[in-house]
């Protein structure tokens, strides 16, 4: 069982009571009254505006946790602004023939285009609403290939990090909320392993768990359509 795995990993971690309260507050803050296209009559809803609404729903959660600039010495990703690494921004500008620029100078239009890339390349739009939100947030937080790896773990597949035929077939059967929650479980397990392997990552541990448990609450309140 997943929670048995978690219990095996937890003993060395002291979880502060105030962190638990913060997690509960975050779940309540981001999880209330969430609905996808519930104000649009079903017969009038088009595929395009449904996808746009779903993207907005996913983005609203991710931006809640990716609000500002970070350059913590223990963060292996380095300089990060609104969830975008400096290295990712460098690649984005280079591919467009633009000169390098500090990530903190990134425009809102560039930010949205990069986020749209995460959405498209993770194939989130093809998924159940709950899974789409989790897949997108995982892609931003861990990278596209790693998001596929987490999905494969949740589906009980070999972890290749590639959206291959077996993954597509398994997703066709497991495109649901349970798979989304299983992905979050896999993220939590990964966090515990990460801090046990590298004590410097404890600086981020409580923030990571706040994000994961808040994501759990967020997707549980999503309507299926």
Functional labels for PLM-detected ranges:
Residues 2-225:
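Cell-wall polysaccharide-cleaving catalytic domain and substrate-binding groove, primarily
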